[in-house]
Amino acid sequence: MNRTRIAVVGVGSLGQHHARILAAMDDVELVGVVEPREDRGREIASKFSTNWYSSPAAVVDQVEGVVVAVPTVLHAEAASCFLQAGRAVMMEKPVAADLATAKRLQQMAEAGGALLQVGHVERFNPAFELLQEKVQSPLYIRCQRVSPYTFRSTDIGVVHDLMIHDIELVQALVNSPVAAVDSFGAVTMGPHEDFAVARLRFESGAIADLTAGRMCPQAERTIQVWSEGGFVSADLQTRKLTSWQPCPAVAARPGMLHDVVAATAAPLTLKDEVFSKWLQQEETQASDADALTAELRDFVAAVRGETRPRVSGIEGVAAMAVAERVLEGMSGWSWQSGSPFEQVRRAA
């Protein structure tokens, strides 16, 4: 069996897990880990029986693909030599720290004939996969993604760190261009926004409201979708889905409950029948399969030419473009006295 030769560039808190998973794959050879901190690089290399390299250039000729998991501001520097050499790259999200750089990386991939995949791991969350199966033609989507301040990814704000997950998810669900964006946010800990709210209006008519924050005592990752077929709520942490849809009688005659109420002497008693008689409720527990493993499996298959990556550079850049519009919309908002958001962002 020919093993696919992969390296991991950056073995911090996330990169070490990429290395662990790839090292355990029988059909993959973990060629090495690239890490500028020698102690850390040698530690992870020893742990997974591979080699340590101090720079990306040292492994370009040895690999078919790489996973780039360095801080966002270093993405372009770390990935350029691989893309130019035609090597496949899976870039952790977001593609880059700004849209112009993200576009340049995608153009570099196209010019070099290289595969560029973006690590939007929530696309591989079994709860989202199940949600996507259940939902057709969404009309309204609401996403909530909040967490405590972890002191990770402090080189970017909450829009590029957290909200971009949900931007990409709703784009996958709606499959329509974004027509308009309204947004606001706040800088609390700084230097970037720690809280953001955005409303996306799609050309299809669908609307999505997104909330992201990293100043909350407890983590939450939920997505709720309303469509003509009913309502689905997914908890992306517990992977539990709850859905409601009208019973056949209601579905066949929208508005029929008005007639039922009119014909009932005590209409307030009907409330006990809503979720037993008129709306059918279903609870589903999605698989506990590891999303990061599934994402890396997708990347390896794409490197071999067996499939198109689920989230290509094109989709990753599209999510970045919407994220930039969210940030632009926040320029007139600030809850930090004397420091308009845009001034704080430019200073950072």
Residue ranges and their predicted role:
Residues 96-153, 338:
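A contiguous active-site-proximal alpha/beta segment in oxidoreductase catalytic domains
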Residues 67-68, 284-286, 291-348:
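C-terminal helix-rich "cap/oligomerization" subdomain common to oxidoreductases
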Residues 150-226, 237-238, 314:
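Rossmann-like dinucleotide-binding domain that binds NAD(P)(H)
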Residues 188, 208-294:
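NAD(P)-dinucleotide binding in Rossmann-like oxidoreductases
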Residues 18, 48-107:
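Beta-loop-alpha module in the N-terminal Rossmann-like domain of NAD(P)-dependent dehydrogenases
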Residues 54, 91, 116-118, 142, ...:
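Hydrophobic residues in well-ordered beta-strands that form the structural core
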Residues 1-48, 170, 346:
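N-terminal Rossmann-like dinucleotide-binding module
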Residues 50, 85-87, 112-115, 206:
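A short helix->loop->beta-strand "cap" motif at the edges of active sites that frequently abuts
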